[in-house]
């Protein structure tokens, strides 16, 4: 819905396409010069598909909101989100060849920092309602430049160590859980830096049990469930894929505890 919002606001016509079990597009329509093809670099794991599509679709737009560390391709319009990867109240990046002569105002994040502070001093659970309210406030916003606060935070981060930690944590989960996962996205032979570890399972109730175990697992694409047939692959993925955390806040000990919890639950659930 975040993508659809500006399209509806600007009265831009759009249509959906299907994806397969590799999260690649199922699409063979010719793209006209007045049209564009938008593809999401899912979880930061689909850079090879992005590169492939860039060779065939001159009007490709890449959604790298889930792939902060993926390099943009020359001549391909690409956008990124800092909020999905780091503890900032706002912030995004746009790579484009278009010339923008508009001086956008700087965003004031004062109303959207409470949940970030609460997560540090207390817990994510205790401030989830604040997070939801912050998300609502971000909807239907006019375009702004990144806030000074987010800019300062992002300028102070050790990105090399963040990349290493995310990849290390992903490898831990991949090694332990691949046998139980309908997805198999290895990062051993590429430079992908994942957002999460996508655990696609048929075990009913695993998400709810993890939440009870105080493991925060956001559900992606809840809007998809209400829009497509339950027999579609996309419906199954949206319903049954669990986004396991791998980010830079978690050390090896924490990841091993997570693996143990999932393994135990996986053995007891039908």
Question: Could you say what each language-model-derived stretch is?
Answer:
Residues 1-68:
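PLP-dependent aminotransferase-like
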Residues 10-15, 33-37, 56-60, 75-81, ...:
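Active-site regions of enzymes building and remodeling cell-envelope glycoconjugates
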Residues 23-28, 48, 69-75, 87-94, ...:
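Short, charged, surface-exposed secondary-structure boundary motifs
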Residues 75-118:
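Active-site PLP attachment segment
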